[in-house]
Design a protein with these regions (language model features):
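Sequence-level preference for short, compositionally simple segments enriched
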Residues: 1-177
Length: 177
């Protein structure tokens, strides 16, 4: 086993993990979803999410992710049944499995800034920062800085922040006096 073939030194499990890291780099997504909800404290459900996308003929690759992380679901992508999605939306699993994986195996990622913001947002969730308006604002700002500065978000950042900061009062005008 010479220096010419260093891959021989990786165990089978370690090889799977490095392969999975490359897959996540190209086909993976970390995000903080922000969904309007009338009964949520600040008007939104805000949650970390992790996904990997593959054509349905490559399901085995998603099953590898399921094997490595020992959790997650696989289902067709909404609106495109030829694409399958492997997903983890459990905050605990993201904290215990995904973040440590990203820190260990995604060290040279072109998307490392997004991964760092994602990890920071998850840390804020773990510290229960999302239970205060100030903490929720921090998390939402991180979310909008991720993935090309939130360009594909449904709502502008200021609209979301305004709703959080006003304490989620109803969107309807009050009685006229």
């Amino acid at each position: 086993m010479g220096a010419g073939n260093q891959q021989e030194r990786l165990s089978g499990e370690e090889s799977k993990r490095w392969f999975l890291a490359g897959l996540i780099e190209g086909e993976g997504s970390v995000c903080i979803s922000i969904k309007t909800h009338g009964t949520a404290r600040f008007g939104y459900y805000v949650d970390p999410e992790f996904f990997i996308y593959q054509h349905r003929t490559r399901r085995s690759v998603l099953e590898l992710a399921q094997e490595v992380f020992q959790t997650g679901w696989i289902k067709p992508k909404h609106g495109n049944p030829d694409v399958l999605v492997y997903g983890i939306t459990s905050r605990r699993t993201i904290t215990e499995k995904i973040i440590p994986f990203l820190k260990r195996y995604m060290t040279y990622s072109a998307r490392s800034a997004d991964f760092e913001r994602f990890a920071r947002a998850v840390e804020l969730f773990e510290a229960k920062a999302h239970q205060t308006a100030e903490g929720m604002v921090q998390i939402v700002r991180l979310a909008y800085q991720m993935n090309h500065d939130g360009k594909q978000r449904k709502r502008p950042l200021e609209e979301v922040l305004d709703r959080i900061l006003r304490g989620h009062t109803p969107d309807t005008p009050g009685p006229q006096g």
